[in-house]
Swiss-Prot record:
Pfam families: PP-binding. This is Acyl carrier protein. Gene3D superfamilies: ACP-like. Pathway: Lipid metabolism; fatty acid biosynthesis. PANTHER family: ACYL CARRIER PROTEIN, CARRIER DOMAIN-CONTAINING PROTEIN. The gene is acpP. It comes from Ruegeria pomeroyi (strain ATCC 700808 / DSM 15171 / DSS-3). Belongs to the acyl carrier protein (ACP) family.
Length: 77
């Protein structure tokens, strides 16, 4: 797993209180990991802070899974 993926996974585990093994590439934040809309906003803010990037609202709406987050952040960093 890449450094970006490790850091994203740590944020997801901390913010959603889920087990690490539940955070898989295709795991949906809402459907699989129990996040609500506020959780997803907080995750995006945490990703922005951790990686020093800005995630526009239209892009944030496309980040639905762990894999989506890793891909977006990898390309933006």
């Amino acid at each position: 797993m890449s450094d970006v993926a490790d850091r994203v996974k740590k944020i997801v585990v901390e913010h959603l209180g889920v087990e690490e093994d539940k955070v898989t590439e295709n795991a949906s934040f809402i459907d699989d990991l129990g996040a609500d809309s506020l959780d997803t906003v907080e995750l995006v803010m945490a990703f922005e802070e951790e990686f020093g990037i800005e995630i526009p609202d239209d892009a944030a709406e496309t980040i639905q899974t762990f894999g989506d987050a890793v891909k977006f952040i990898s390309e933006a960093s």
